[in-house]
Amino acid sequence: MKTASLPEMPEEFEVSPEDHELVQELYQIWDNLNQRTMLEAWHDAQQIREESLDLFSHGIVDLKTRAQIERMYWSVCREINRIAAGLKHVPDEFRNLDKLLADKYFCNFSLFQSLPDLWALDQIFPIMPIQRLDERPDRTATLQDITCDSDGKITNFVTSRSVTHDLPVHTVKAKESYYIGVFLVGAYQEILGDMHNLFGDTNAVHVSVDDKGYSIDQVIDGETVAEVLDYVQYNPKKLVRNLETWVTKSVKEGKISLEEGKEFLANYRSGLYGYTYLE
């Protein structure tokens, strides 16, 4: 799983006289932020950010200044959100801050294949991490799929009390998988799912549960790239033959070595007859 977070200014950052006046102004807003000033600070920070974007597009401020303002702006937003969380009555301007500030967790699935009702009907399914349950979540996130479609995301989550715009999650550890479960989906979603971006059926497991525990009855492999391409009239065997012809010609002409040709063909076959999702 890959994640993306909004930039944040380090706590130890100090503004210098050489910094752009917009940076200095936004720093003062950030440094003096409190419950009494947060509404004015919110509007001022937005204005400074918009002004910096305009100046950057005209080449008046450089990339370093643009990055400083961006990090500081989101730091102001985080601090306002922290203060607002303790208020009994939260101003309307701050009600969507949780959604804006949430990390993005990119998950290895297609929303259109596995959860079509979520996209088409705004259906809400129970979703939660299924590991590290003995650890308190330290982040919040929205979930993104691996299609190229901007609608391939989950931004509504059910809790015991209401619907929220972010999901409590853990910081993903380097080189470690992180699994999130979607529940009460059922076979109906599988029947409705389509091959958006040519992502096929996922792997499936049939599990039986009794008083003694559980047993895995059957493992069903998901569709391969070759199978999905065949649906849209691309013959996998012909694709391999065409590549073999090109490799043979390239080796004869000295464009690639024999070892490079073999490796290229092996990688191509591995991808073609492999899973449509990341492995």
Give the location of each predicted region.
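Charged (often Lys/Glu-rich) extended helix/loop segments that serve as interaction or gating elements
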Residues: 1-279
